Amino acid sequence: MSEFQLVSPYQPTGDQPKAIAGLVKSISEGHRFQTLLGATGTGKTFTIAHTIQQVGRPTLVMAHNKTLAAQLCNELRELFPHNAVEYFISYYDYYQPEAYVPSTDTYIAKSSSINDEIDMLRHSATRSLFERRDVIVVASVSCIYGLGMPEEYLKASIPFKVGQEINQRDVLRDLASIQYERNDLELVRGRFRLKGDVLEIVPAYEDRVIRIEFFGDEIEAIRLIDPVTGEILNSLSALRVYPARHFVTPEAQLERAILNIEQELEEQLALFRKEGKLLEAQRLEQRTRYDLEMLREVGYCNGIENYSRHLTGRKAGEPPACLVDYFKADDWLLVVDESHVTVPQIRGMYNGDRARKQVLVDHGFRLPSALDNRPLKAEEFWAKVHQCIFVSATPGNWELEQSEAQFETRVEDGKTLKFYVQGSGRVIEQVIRPTGVVDPEVHVRPTAGQVDDLLGEIYLRLERSQLGPAERVIVTTLTKRMAEDLTEYLQERGIRVRYLHSEITSIERIEILQDFREGAFDVLVGVNLLREGLDLPEVSLVAILDADKEGFLRAERSLIQMIGRAARNVRGMVVMYADTMTSSMARAIAETQRRREIQLQYNRQHNITPKPIVKKNSNAILSFLAISRKLNDPDLEKAFQAAQEIPLSEIPELIGQLELKMKEAAKNLEFEEAAQLRDRIKKLRQRLLGHPQGI
């Protein structure tokens, strides 16, 4: 029986029961790849949640960016409140990789800032994978980067049990060996302190305190303590403390690694000198000798990850261990969300990393073994995957091929193209929306007078908004300049309009989308920012300017994704402005019409009247400062209430800002406000972890 407990007031409807049954059947039959081809707004996440619940295996859900990963994690935590739904993304707030530009002889040192909260979540994810089966890890593509060997990580963990006899000095030495730091004054994550017979540890994977009480050398009690109030939260009979860092190197392995690094250094120096590269040889020797001295003395050096091949005992070219290796062999499931974007990302990670590091090696900044500190190659990643579900409204041909779909070839515009044959292979379609809302009508109109025609459509929706539910408009252009010019033109005619393009920061982007949903303006103009993951049920019109300009932004998949932005509204409509009908346009329109006819027929058969989507507005402002500015109210309580709904990916940033405010308040002797902020930081950390964890 599955350990996953799905909690929802809703039952699967429309195509969902058929899709769930199809996916579960395909997986239970042992098929490696299957695809959920689900139209926008059909509840693909709900279908995947039911599939996970019925399959009952630990699951990795991959998304193509951290914002989408946070959205998925929030949704899955609501559906699985009693299970471990973890969040695993890159822990860098800022990252400037090491690089060298030969043309200008410019060396750029690595510069980074690690987010402590996200690091805690990463440790929480790996701990859950060791200790339970009912685990869903939602991750970005960065999870294919090296993470340290799971065997060494588990082997280095320290078990504690009530009644166990253990020398206190040995415990302190063991904690130090797995990167915990002793500090008897300030107890924070990754530190421990000993006072008399009481040892207190804050593990790497959460902020609760583990208190171990000794009677002589015998463990008398193990308790979980609230770090703020000191309240006893739980008493345990046993627990295991995992290392403070994922990269764990035993002392014997470190000594072997140092010898291997020295040997590689001598070989590379001989090669450089033979080729007359004396500057490169001098540079490499100086840098590497310093690193070796640091490794001997303190077991660590800056850029230690560049020696990871030696430290983990891998051979040249062997893939590094990553998050996938923390899952148990073949007993797990992979779900790739928005696979048409995520799969190419997996494919491209290795090449970009390799090109940068090769320059460093060629010019004596790094040993050749640094090339093995890398993300997995695509083929290495897929070799580790036992069973997988691709999820997309527009899956790529590669995903469809892996799902054994059939294709037909046609010549269009002088090119031979492959097209998926509907209903073939292990491709499960999900077309019917639970709300009964059908795909929008698509109209093609000439480009002559397109702006005036668009203006008329906008005015029509503004008039309807006065009498009924609010309607919004999305307009997509081909260039940033066009977006800005169109925005200015519409503003001059009294339209409340904003634009989005690549130069707008992620925080500003979410603020603009939030204002759009709340009705602060009615028209949003953008370039390539209005496709996957933009969930706005208020949008009743999507206008696509220059739809006949073939290219990535007007390819079939891009057009279907843009059409999908109007597919959540009962009055959804799409207008493509074009003078010719391109093959991409024709295919996108034909697919939309095919889905629309299926949906209309289903509604007629089941006497369903489409209902507008009522969606909780959860994309709140991303930072405390933005919340305060938006409310125009210094009242901390109101600002914090607004902060309760922020996306999961932004909580670490908010915690950092609240901590700065807390320290500033304490410095100004405003202890009451500092205490309020401390309590709120604690609540946000609890939300970040997502569920009360037993250790």
Swiss-Prot record:
Protein family (similarity comment): Belongs to the UvrB family.
Domain Helicase ATP-binding: 25-176
GO biological process: nucleotide-excision repair; SOS response
Keyword vocabulary terms for this entry: ATP-binding, Cytoplasm, DNA damage, DNA excision, DNA repair, Excision nuclease, Helicase, Hydrolase, Nucleotide-binding, SOS response
SUPFAM superfamilies: C-terminal UvrC-binding domain of UvrB, P-loop containing nucleoside triphosphate hydrolases
Protein name, UniProt field: UvrABC system protein B
Domains: entry comment: The beta-hairpin motif is involved in DNA binding.
InterPro entries named among the record's database cross-references: Helicase/UvrB_N (IPR006935), Helicase_ATP-bd (IPR014001), Helicase_C-like (IPR001650), P-loop_NTPase (IPR027417), UVR_dom (IPR001943), UVR_dom_sf (IPR036876), UvrB (IPR004807), UvrB_inter (IPR041471)
Main location: cytoplasm
Pfam families per UniProt: Helicase_C (PF00271), ResIII (PF04851), UVR (PF02151), UvrB (PF12344), UvrB_inter (PF17757)
Subcellular location: Cytoplasm
Quaternary assembly: Forms a heterotetramer with UvrA during the search for lesions. Interacts with UvrC in an incision complex.
Residue sites binding ATP per the record: 38-45
Family matches, as CDD domains: DEXHc_UvrB, SF2_C_UvrB
Motif (Beta-hairpin): 91-114
Any GO molecular function: helicase activity
Residue span(s) of domain Helicase C-terminal: 454-617
Domain UVR: 652-687
Role of this protein: The UvrABC repair system catalyzes the recognition and processing of DNA lesions. A damage recognition complex composed of 2 UvrA and 2 UvrB subunits scans DNA for abnormalities. Upon binding of the UvrA(2)B(2) complex to a putative damaged site, the DNA wraps around one UvrB monomer. DNA wrap is dependent on ATP binding by UvrB and probably causes local melting of the DNA helix, facilitating insertion of UvrB beta-hairpin between the DNA strands. Then UvrB probes one DNA strand for the presence of a lesion.
One GO CC term, this protein: excinuclease repair complex
